[in-house]
């Protein structure tokens, strides 16, 4: 049985029928694998986009951390409203929502950085 570390840092067993378990949000990865939704992965991706624009010194900025936290909350709340009983999301839907929240909150440069990174990763996957 596979284990996954959750956003709280605990290990969670993922059963083969995890995709059928009600009440949980799950993410379908590009390879078709279904994993537990992890808010921290969204937060890390947003922070990396901010660091790409603001520079590594932004990692110590309370302002940046607060903005990243709020943006992460905004992204997660969209999916919680859409699927209050849980459900499956495709990774692309999550990434699209991150882009949208960055733009709505007037972080155009960060959104551009995020989009360019997504495109770069897409090209790398296509070459593999």
Regions found by a protein language model. Give the residues of each.
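Extended catalytic cores of very large enzyme megasubunits
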Residues: 1-128
